[in-house]
């Protein structure tokens, strides 16, 4: 175990916690409660930093920690909360009783972030589709305005990108299997490919 002397302070242990250290911290917090972790470290006799004590208690020692794999309901809640809050793991973990923010973050990074539909669900509400040629997100008129871009004339990005294929595409012309949103954004059904819209000659 490494010990480091900080200027004007006593030695601070680093590295793995020993079972006897866990017992000291657990016993002290159960007797005196949580509070100033640097003070807890000093009063309990542990030669650990306050942050180290806090994280050890929060992630490993507190009695209400839930162990075991995530349930489907917990997975679904993590995906929905991440879509709403982003990487604010402590807030997400607050909605999952017994789960720590560190556990939720690790679970997201190892299991959920790699799933294609979780990435899709995680896209901001204002990005509702992608152009079939560049795979760039199609932004809503409101989002373009907030970025200082034009409105109606810039809603035709997809139309301009199809022109070099020699197809006669006009704004407002009906195309099958394309959804029109109120803000003129086009959304393609991902079940169909480019050739479903434009057969190759």
UniProtKB/Swiss-Prot annotation:
Give the signal peptide range.
Answer: none
**Short name of any one Pfam family annotated for the protein:** Myb_DNA-binding
Report the GO terms under cellular component: nucleus
Please indicate which superkingdom the organism of origin belongs to. Eukaryota
Q: Does the keyword Transport belong to this entry? A: no
Ranges for region Disordered: 112-133
Question: Which UniProt key words apply to this protein?
Answer: Developmental protein, DNA-binding, Nucleus, Repeat, Transcription, Transcription regulation
Q: What does the comment on domains in this protein's record state?
A: The N-terminal domain is necessary and sufficient for dimer formation. The C-terminal domain is responsible for the transcription activation function.
Oligomeric state and interaction partners are given as: Homodimer and heterodimer with GL1. Part of the WD40-bHLH-MYB complex. Interacts with BHLH012/MYC1 and BHLH042/TT8. Interacts (via N-terminus) with GL1 and GL3.
State the name under which the record lists this protein: Transcription factor MYB82
**Per the UniProt entry, what species is this protein from, by scientific name?**
Arabidopsis thaliana
Question: What gene is this protein translated from?
Answer: MYB82
């Amino acid at each position: 175990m490494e010990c480091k002397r900080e200027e004007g302070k006593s030695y601070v242990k680093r590295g793995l916690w020993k079972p006897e250290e866990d017992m000291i911290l657990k016993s002290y917090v159960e007797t005196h409660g949580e509070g100033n972790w640097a003070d807890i470290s000093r009063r309990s006799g542990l030669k650990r930093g306050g942050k180290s004590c806090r994280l050890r208690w929060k992630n490993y020692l507190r009695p209400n920690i839930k162990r075991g794999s995530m349930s489907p309901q917990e997975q679904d809640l993590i995906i929905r909360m991440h879509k709403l809050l982003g990487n604010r793991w402590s807030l997400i973990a607050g909605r999952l009783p017994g789960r720590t923010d560190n556990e939720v973050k690790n679970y997201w990074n190892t299991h959920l972030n790699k799933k294609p539909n979780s990435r899709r669900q995680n896209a901001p509400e204002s990005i509702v589709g992608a152009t079939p040629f560049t795979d760039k997100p199609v932004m809503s008129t409101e989002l373009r305005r907030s970025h200082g871009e034009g409105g109606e004339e810039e809603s035709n990005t997809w139309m301009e990108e199809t022109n070099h294929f020699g197809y006669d595409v006009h704004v407002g012309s009906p195309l099958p299997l394309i959804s029109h949103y109120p803000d003129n954004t086009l959304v393609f059904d991902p079940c169909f490919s480019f050739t479903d819209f434009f057969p190759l000659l």
